[in-house]
Amino acid sequence: MSPSAAVLIPLAAAVLLRPVVGQTQCGGNLYTPGTLNFTLECYNAFQDCVAQFEANASQVDCNDGKGNLFMQQQANLGASPGSQNNDAIIAFQDIRDLCLLSGSTTATWGYSDNQWYWAAAEDACYTNDPTRTDVVKTHPAPFCIQNRDSSLPECYPQPDATPPGGPLKVIKTAKTRNGFKSSARGWNTYGVQALVNGSQVVPSFAGQSGLFYTQKFVETQCGVLARPEFKKAGYDLCSLDSGWQATTAVDQHGRIIYNTTRFNLPELASWLHKRDLKLGVYITPGVPCLAHNQTILGTNIKIKDVLNGNNDQINCDFDFRKDGVQQWHDSVVAQWASWGVDMLKLDFLTPGSPSNGANLACDSSDAVRAYQKAIKKSGRKIRLDISWKLCRNETWLPIWSDLAESMRTDQDLDNYGTNTLMAWQVGQRAIENYRQYIGLQAQRNVPLTIYPDMDALFTVNPEHLAGVNDTIRYTVQNHWLGAGANLIIGGDMEQVDALGLKLTTSKQSIDAADFFAKYPMQPRNPGTGSNAAKQLQAWIGGPSDDHEAYVLIVNYGPDLGNGGFSTKLYGKQKVTVSLKDLGISGSAWTFTDIWSGKSSRVTGSYSAWLTEGESQLLRLKRTH
C-alpha cells in the first residue's frame, strides 16, 4: 500500500459523517509536479504530525525537528471535545495531495467552523535525484481548487454584441436528448429547506430543518399540486432536493438508497403517480465512500477498485476509464426507475459550480454521460437536470446541450440567513445570467436542445414569505416564463395566495409557458435593438410561424450589485420600444398585456411607465 493510500482509507469514513467543505490555498515556491519527488523522511514526519494533531486539539505546532517541515493547527477549542479539530485529517490530506505533492511548498486550509491548518516544506523535502527510492512521487493536483470568490470568468463569456438595428434571428427549441418538448413544472423542497428556520413560517415543516425533512412534509406540499388548477397547468413534478438519501448506508451493491427513517421512495412514488404526479430526486457525482467494499451489481468488481479520490461532498469520485463504473450507474438508475423516479437533478458539476469551497474534479461531465446512458438503458422516461452555473463557453454549451433536459444558469436564488425565499438583488443576478446564456445560445445558430434552469420559482407566496413585493413577483414570473425555464415552485404550497395562483395556473400563464417552450425570449434593447444589459430593457420571443410573439418590457430598478447594467435610475421610468428595435417592423401588431388584458394596435413604437422592478408581458399578434 502506498503512503498516500494509507491515509485515504480512514479519511473516507471520516468524511461520511458530514460533508466537509474546506478551502485549500496553495502558496510558497512553485515547482512542476513530476520533476521533483517528496522525501519519505518528510512524508513520514508529516504523517506523524497529523497523528499528533488529531490526538491533541490543543497542540498548535509540530515539525520534523530538522528545520525542513513545519505544521500548525488552530482548533476550535470552544467546541465540544469531539468537534474541536475534527477536520484535521481531511484538511491535511488536502494540504498534502493538492499542494505539497502537487506543485507548491506551503498550504493553508480553512473552514467556517473556526478550524485552520497550515504546513510548509523546505527545499530539503524535495529531490530531483532519479536514483532515490525513499521518496513519494509528486503529481498534478487531482482536483480543481477554486477560490471561494472565483467567478470562473473563462466559463461565462459575454455574448457577442449585436449591432444596433440588426435583424432578428428567432431562437427556437427542439426536443431534448430524452425527447422532452418543454421544461419541467412542479415544486421542489429546497426553497423551504434553505430558510433559516422554516418551521416558523411553513406549518407543514414544523420540527424539521435543512436536510432533515420528511415524506409527510413532501406529501402535504405535493398534495396541492394534485389539485385541478395545478394539474391543468402542467405542474406535475414533486422534486426532492438533498436530504432524502441515507448518509450512513448503501445497499449490498453500493447503490444510493433513501433514508428509511424519514422516507419510503417506492411508496411516495406510488402515492404521487396515483395523483398523476411525478417524482424527482437530487444527487451529486460519485458514490458514497462507505460503499468501497461493495461489489457492483452484475460484476465481480469492488467499488474501491474503480475510485479516483474523495471530493469532500460525502461521495468518492469514480475513475471513468475503468470497467464497472458504467455498470454501477446503470444499476443505480435501474433501481430508481423501479421505485418510480421520473427526474434526476445532478448537482455540483464541473466545469462550473464556482465558489463551492470543495475539492471537485476539474471535469465531471463523464458523470453526466454515465447517468444519461443509464437513463436510456433503464427504459423509463426520466428528465435529467444538471447544476449549477455550468460553464457555458463555446466548448461546453454544446456538450451540456447534448446531455440533459435543463442546465442551471446561475447560483442559488435562495435568500440564505433569512425566513424569506428570495431578494430582488439575487433576482437581478439570475436574469443577467440568463441574458448571457441566451445570447451565447443564439450565437450557435442551431435549435436549442436544453432548457435553462434559473432555480426555483418564488412567486406563489405573499411578500412576507416570498421576500419581494407583488410587482416584482409579476416580474419574476414574466422572466421565468419568457426564458422557457424550469417552472419549479419553491416555497409553501399551502400558502399560495390569489396572485400566486394567477401567475402559475391562469390560462394566460399556461399559454405563455407553452409558447416560450418553443421560442425563448432574447434581449432587444429599447432604442437600439442590441443585446446588452440595460436597466430599461425589452425582450422578444418569436415570432412564430403563425405570426405570434411575446414581448417583455421591464424597469429593473437601480442595479443592486449583480444586474450587469450598473445604472441607478430611481422611481417610474418611461420605457419605449419600437417595432424596429424588436426586429419586427413592416407590419402592424396588436399588443396585449397578458395580466391586465389591455390591448393596443402598434405600428411604430410602444411605451409604458414602469416603476422599479415593474414589467409588462405582452402578447403580440400581427394584424396584416
Swiss-Prot record:
GO terms for biological process: carbohydrate metabolic process. Glycans are attached at N37, N56, N197, N259, N293, N393, N469. The keyword Ubl conjugation does not apply. GO terms for cellular component: extracellular region. It is found in: Secreted. InterPro entries: Aldolase_TIM, Glyco_hydro_27, Glyco_hydro_b, Glycoside_hydrolase_SF, Melibiase_C. GO terms for molecular function: alpha-galactosidase activity. Keywords: Glycoprotein, Glycosidase, Hydrolase, Secreted, Signal. It comes from the Eukaryota. It catalyses: Hydrolysis of terminal, non-reducing alpha-D-galactose residues in alpha-D-galactosides, including galactose oligosaccharides, galactomannans and galactolipids. Its EC number is 3.2.1.22. Alpha-galactosidase involved in the degradation of simple oligosaccharides like melibiose, raffinose and stachyose, and of polymeric galacto(gluco)mannans. This is Alpha-galactosidase 3. It comes from Hypocrea jecorina (Trichoderma reesei). The lineage of its organism: Eukaryota, Fungi, Dikarya, Ascomycota, Pezizomycotina. The gene is agl3.
